[in-house]
Amino acid sequence: MEKTQSVFIRFIVNGSLVKQILIGLVAGIVLALVSTPAAIAVGLLGSLFVGALKAVAPVLVLMLVIASIANHKKGQKTSIRPILFLYVLGTFSAALVAVVVSFIYPSTLILVAESADITPPSGIVEVLHGLLNSIIANPIHALLNANYIGILAWAVGLGIALRHAADTTKALINDMSDAVTLVVRVVIRFAPLGIFGLVASTIAATGFGALQLYAQLLVVLIGCMLLVALVVNPLIVYWKIRRNPYPLVFACLRESGVTAFFTRSSAANIPVNMEMCKKMNLNEDTYSISIPLGATINMAGAAITITVLTLAAVHTLGITVDLPTALLLSVVAAICACGASGVAGGSLLLIPLACSMFGIPNDVAMQVVGVGFIIGVLQDSAETALNSSTDVLFTAAVCQAEDAKLANPDPLAAGKSV
């Protein structure tokens, strides 16, 4: 009996989060079919989970950005600027693709919001005015009211100032960042229970139409990611290496993307990417920096997630978006994506920042985050696969172009697969 309990506890604490979320998803559907009152009652679990996310997200953004900027090392001579440019170009292109696809195939979410609470901006001028006012907000006020734009502004400013701090101070900042990340991981471990409550109460209240809407949203998300992985990224790589990019693209998807799909963490996939770069005989001084950096800031998949879910919320609430505002959303989504920082589900926690552009209240934005967690079993896995495989793809493209030595048609021909 004790052995059985030990195995069960080990599965709950250390088991696969993907499997647990799937179990919660199925259990929520079954409960909604069996007992509508019970399904509505367990909606409390979903509310508590979303509330915990709402509480921890502002602190997470603040500490991750401060730690990242404060610990940037000077004097590292590498050819990283071209790779950094590709990271930025790829992330912005992904957000742009997501905007276009979302306009062609708009998605609708099940949200609980009163139209009186929504004050949409009239155009790009009002959006910029709101952004500027958000930037100069009091930092404590920004944290209390989940003003993510103000939080980002203060985090960047403090991070730059703390780059000149003593090593002990930087170590303390790193420890604080790690502590907040640990809290986030603990909260996310409760995702199966939260999703169980969200799915059960949603189906009980709205019927299976909600799942069909989420299925459409998932198709749009995965479709955008496939479009970026198989069309946009190859075009960028071809522009850099001037030859058929698909052998390199497919090698990166095969060697890096598959493992990242299951780990659901760009940071956890860094050793795999490092080994792949080594087998392709790339410049070690370059990839030893670009791969960890890419795990933090190269977030094409996150940009897609933020953009698609934000525009889905906008469409659901009936807010009209003009072209300049949509382009600005692409920029904001690309910047937001850089804050995902390799944490599983991290991009979902940054959706409220993009939603704030359109006057969407934080409570409604966190409902969008809840929707993201419902579809996150596939969404987060596909997002991480795109993010991590793009790290090694762009690093290899720049290294091969700058070495002026084009590799064999199969970039891993000289060595076996990882």
Curated annotation (Swiss-Prot):
MF GO annotations: neutral L-amino acid:sodium symporter activity
Gene Ontology CC: plasma membrane
Keywords: Amino-acid transport, Cell inner membrane, Cell membrane, Membrane, Symport, Transmembrane, Transmembrane helix, Transport
Subcellular location: Cell inner membrane
Swiss-Prot/TrEMBL GO biological process terms: serine transport; threonine transport
Swiss-Prot/TrEMBL catalytic activity: L-serine(in) + Na(+)(in) = L-serine(out) + Na(+)(out); L-threonine(in) + Na(+)(in) = L-threonine(out) + Na(+)(out)
Main localisation: membrane
InterPro entries: Na-dicarboxylate_symporter (IPR001991), Na:dicarbo_symporter_sf (IPR036458), Ser_Thr_transp_SstT (IPR023025)
Source superkingdom: Bacteria
Membrane-protein topology: Multi-pass membrane protein
Membrane-crossing segments per the record: 21-41, 49-69, 83-103, 142-162, 190-210, 217-237, 299-319, 331-351
Disulphide-bonded residues: none
General function of this protein: Involved in the import of serine and threonine into the cell, with the concomitant import of sodium (symport system).
Family assignment from sequence similarity: Belongs to the dicarboxylate/amino acid:cation symporter (DAACS) (TC 2.A.23) family.
Protein name per Swiss-Prot or TrEMBL: Serine/threonine transporter SstT
Species name: Yersinia pestis
